[in-house]
Structures are given as structure tokens and as C-alpha cells.
UniProtKB/Swiss-Prot annotation:
PROSITE patterns: PGLYCERATE_KINASE
Residues the entry annotates as binding ATP: K206, G302, E333, G359, G360, D361, S362
Protein name: Phosphoglycerate kinase
InterPro entries with a match to the protein in the record: Phosphoglycerate_kinase, Phosphoglycerate_kinase_CS, Phosphoglycerate_kinase_N, Phosphoglycerate_kinase_sf
Amino acid sequence: MKTIDELLAEGVAGKRVFVRADLNVPLDGTTITDDGRIRAVVPTIAKLAEAGARVVVASHLGRPKGAPDPAFSLAPAATRLGELLGAEVAFAADTVGESARAAVAGLADGRVAVVENLRFNAGETSKDDAERGAFADQLAQLADVYVGDGFGAVHRKHASVFDLPARLPHYAGYLIATEVGVLKKLTTDVHRPYAVVLGGAKVSDKLGVIDHLLERADRILIGGGMAYTFLKAKGYEVGSSLLQEDQIPAVREYLRRAEEKGVEFVLPVDVVVAPSFPDLKTKAPAHPTTVAADAMPAGQMGLDNGPETNKLYASKLADAATVFWNGPMGVFEHPDFADGTRAVAQALVDSSAFSVVGGGDSAAAVRILGFDENAFGHISTGGGASLEYLEGKTLPGLAALED
């Protein structure tokens, strides 16, 4: 995989460099609530601009239906990128149309333009190779060189990620090079004890990575909505908590295999429950109570790890040399259910372990709960991408950069 440093050594002054970034940031209306993904790509864009490139930045945001939708416009992200770069950033109101062509044609050396949301075009995410290829052909007309730096999208076989690099000289940006380097440490040269913390809503999203980690991790700590399927698999009642009944046989098999391989599987011993899911807009009090994990009452929903679990998990992380964490321990967006996620983050801050926060909601939680990002070994920008990398899957966006 050739890197941006090789491109810079060849010289980029006056060249149109297409940067496939990941500006898929959470929005409240037009207000960005977490700009972490934008900040992560700034080093690549800034270095290219400094070297005199004409930088064309493209990204997706959200899941529009292959047509323009103002709710998913990249305009707020383009504005924020300009603030972070300390330079004016042009914004094109379409992706490959008249506005985009004019914005790119008007770029002076060292300037940056952002084109509108890639997913406003059906060809970006099409399952049809020809349709995707046709859109990639249009994108290729905007550039002379391709730099892949949207790690959060490398697991997608999309036109801008997979097809476009085949049409242009291609290089990996700083973010992708860093992300791959960190994840390689977790797969090839891991320092032990190796602890993994998995949370989030659905156990089905994590089965592949659990299967992989049973061969590598020393202990696996489970939290979040997925924990209740594990507790049910152990024979506990879980009230009205999130439950994937169809996954119980798979979970039981993983618990059996973990025991067989000597991998410690750690589940909550107490949980914070409430009668219903909390209101995340008003943050109204949710009337939580703490109960033992094996004594959850009917009609109550588990929404966070309890204080005894938080102490237990902190003790299990204290002596780890390496920690990978993906997924919050509870509904951290509500103050009544944030302590479990906060406790894991604090345990990683207090530990001397090399800690990797695996993107998505856990990365957002670290920032929202006020932790210093530099206190962690690495905060990934790719939730799904980092999980699929750890599963050993071929990621289309990385494979395209290898060729």
C-alpha cells in the first residue's frame, strides 16, 4: 500500500487530488455534535494543500436513499473543515454535476473543495458493478490522483471506496495508515494480558469478532444491550430488556468454547433498570434502580451496568497490557445510564495498557463524557471497519489501495 508520503515525494503541486474522507458526523439539525471524524482527516488534507495540491474532498453522511436530501448535506461538515484548516473551503452543491465541476475547475493550488454527499447518487452504493463503475468514472473526471483516508468506510464496496482507486493512481492517507498500523498490533503482535470490552445493542453485530477473539483474547467483558442475551443464555430472567432470542444458541456455544479455551468471559453482576427506555431529548429523570443481574424484575429494562459490575470490570482491566473496546455499556446519552460507560473509559485512562477505542458510539461516548482523547492509546474512526478488520475479513477499501 503506497502512502501519501510517497505521493508528496513525487510532487503534487497543481494536481487535483481526490481525498475520500469520512465526514459522517452526527448532526442535530445543522449542528455537528461530534467533529472527531473531521479532525481525524485534517492532517492529510492540510499536508496536501501545503504541498500545492488542489484538494477535492468527498464523503458520505448518513443513509440518504440515493437522491439529494437536505437533512444529509455535507455543508456543515465543509464549514467545520474550513474552521479546522484555518482556510476557506469551497462547497459544491452536487457531487459530480455542474457545481462540482465548477468548484474543482476554480481551485487554485493549495486550496480545498468539498463536494456534496456521495450517497445522493444511487451509483455510490449500488450492488450493480456497472452502475457503481459508471459513477466512479464520473468521480474520476474530477481528479488526477486518489487518496483513501475514510477508514470508517473501508468495509463498504462502494464506488468512491472500491471502484475509484482502480481508475487513478492511489495512495493511503495518514489516517488509514495509522488505523491499519494500530489494528495490526491487535492481530499480530499483541501484548498480554489482552482484554476486550464489547458493548452496544445487538449481539448479532459482534458474533464474528467474538468468534475471532476467542482465539486471541485472554478475557472478554460484555456490556450494553447485548449483555441481556448473554444473561438469558445463562438462564437468568431479563425483564423487558433488549433480547435477541434467536442468538441464544450461538451465545451458549461461545460461552462453552471460551471455557474450553480458558478465555475468561465476564458478564454484569448487577444492572441499572428502568420501566422504559429514557427520553434522550429532554433527559427527564428515568427513575432507575439497581438490581442483581440474576434477579431482574419483570417489566423492567436493563439500561446500564451497575456499580458492582463497574468495580469488577475496572479490576479486570487494571492489569491488562492491551485493551480493545467497542460499544458503550449502557445508554450513555442519558445521565442516569452513563456510569457503566464512564467506568470503562476511566479504567482505561487509569491503566498503563495500550488501549484502542474501536470507533462508533464508544468513540463518541469518550468525547461526550469529557475524557481527554490523548489519554487513550488510539481512538479509531471506524466502528464497523475496525470490527471487520479484527474478524480477518478483506476490507474492499483497503484491498483497492493495495493493488
